Amino acid sequence: MGINVSRTADLGSNQWLQRFVGRQHIAHDDEAFWNGLLNYNIVLPENSQDQLNLDSRLEALCQSFIGNNLKTGNFGSLVTVFLEKTSELLSLSDQESNMHVWQTFNALFIIRSLVKYINETGSEFQLLQHFEAMPNAELLQAALEQQQQTPAESATIAMEATEQSAAAAVPVIVDGSKFETFIDALVNLIVVIPVKEFTYHLHLEAVNMLITLLSVHLFAQQPTDKSIVFRTVFKCQHANVLMSALLHFVARIVEVPHTMFGSSSAGSFVFGIAESLLSIFTFRKQPDILKAGQAAGGGELSQRFRTHYPLANQSLLLILILTNHCTAQDNAYRTSLFSCADSKDSPKQGAVSFQIDFSAVYETLCTIVTIDQATLLLYLLLHRNERFYRFVMQQQDLEQLVIPILQTLYNAPDSNSHHIYMSLIVLLILSEDEGFNKNVHTIMLKNITWYTERTISEISLGGILILIVIRTIQYNMLKMRDKYLHTNCLAALANMSGHFRALHPYVAQRLVSLFETLARKHTRLDAQLKEPADSAVFVNVSTTPEDMLQDLSVLEEVLRMVLEILNSCLTNQLVYCPNLVYTLLYKRSVFEGFRSHHAFQDVIQNIDMVVGFFSSRLQRVQEQRGELGVNEVLEVISKGASQWSSDRLRKFPDLKFKYVEEDAPEEFFIPYVWTLVCKYGCVHFSSESIKSVTTDIAC
């Protein structure tokens, strides 16, 4: 049989599409028509401009479809054809299924294009009407009779008038079960049909179809618990296997085949037995592509991930949609993700939704964690899946995960505030584990080329982590002024402080300099508030004394926390942190203005006691030897540390902070997730039609 190849350019004039959207009913068993309609090749839109071009070519066809389908039920016939072909795929051999896969993909692509159009221009009610509409014999007969009786030049106007009057008297005939059956078929396609080279795009299209259906949230202003689409998807009986399949697609990051369905560039299909066998995926990874993107930055990596690994990218986005919506009710997808287990383990406690190779998930996340959607998935797994959290804490190469997160924070001006926030929360969650806080100081790194503030030939992972968090605090003070960002930064440092070890001299300097910077700001702000109202000059006219008082209060909380972090290190790890003691001796004057301040005096007493102890020892040695060099001072500190007892210090509670999700987290996560879908996904939606979610978050 010959194959008719339709290109994007001639979609609008395609006779098969014109018949499909026309006024005549086409039965689902009209094989000649469906073979003609579904034998086409199309270049998928790669960006929003491609999608805009495709949409403009389909506009007239879509309008005809909207006007006629509720009478013809042709959309329902197409859905039935898709359901039949999906069912048949399960029983066909590879060689037999090549043409079937191609036609199934084409059917699904047409369905998705129409669903997208209805979502963007209509309502969910209209979408479901078109899904369920069956041929209306009365309306079709009225149209046919009118067409036969009316001269050609006025046939169209008369036909529309007849249809409108008939439609007023005759309700739309609907099936009632087709939409739910369609959702089940999509899930079956994703989880049952194996991913091979010639099925890759079919799986991708099925995932994109689910995302497109759920995008009804973007274009409607009703809550998702009232949405039939959401209720149908979220009551799916196969949540575990769907979540398992999607996470496997992410973990395996299989590169997109060079050709769709194994076709040649000429558009014909040539499949021999050997070629069919060779088309089966071995799920090998292509790390060089992503590593090159990782080196270039998060934006470049996002582009490479979407272009070269679209199935993994879209599966990741769909996971985020499914797990962040409907959190107030029982969400089977969310429960499934949070209760999965390592396939190399035999969990004895707790329910297990499915098993997956955690090492593959971990390795993939390490590779792509600098992109927003990967950071979000990592957050969900660490925060809510205890098994995965324990697995990560046991890894010997934690730098593979932590360093990319630190790079995201280091490149804060190029990252969006949401990504910075989530990256910090991930660090905070990691810092809740004492083993992590100890291990980061035993992992040594050399030549950190991306850290350009200062050349550091060797530093511990813990040391560079402290430097980046301090830098983030200072960046936030200047640019973002986000109290919650400060809180998360300081909480992570506080959790780690009792385990600081072998701090690099520069790290010790930055810790004390952080207090010094904050102290200067406090002094300046306090002085401004104490000036007479008539002589006070405010640089920012929008800043009131009340605002400044609030800023001062926040600043005092931050200063207090920094002092407690220093105190925690001195109390627990003084003998292992001579460089910090050295810096405190050198910078002792920065604490002078706060010794009598009620908010700081108790903790500063401890710091003063340490400084006094080592200062007196240095003075005695200097009296004997004269002026001491840096190494000699450190030698005195090390000897003194062996005789120091922390019992002299006032006891404070251990600094232990745990991340707690705020109330109504969906208010943060749902807009964020859909912003990522719109910006980094393979499905491009009309931004002009979006109502319920703003997509102007800078990603």
Swiss-Prot record:
Lipidation (N-myristoyl glycine): 2
Sites bearing Phosphoserine, chain numbering: 346
A Pfam entry, by short name: Dymeclin
Disulfide bonds: none
Keyword Ion transport among record annotations: no
Highest taxon of source: Eukaryota
InterPro entries per record: Dymeclin (IPR019142)
Any single Gene Ontology cellular-component annotation: Golgi apparatus
GO BP field: Golgi organization
Family per similarity comment: Belongs to the dymeclin family.
Protein's name according to its UniProt entry: Dymeclin
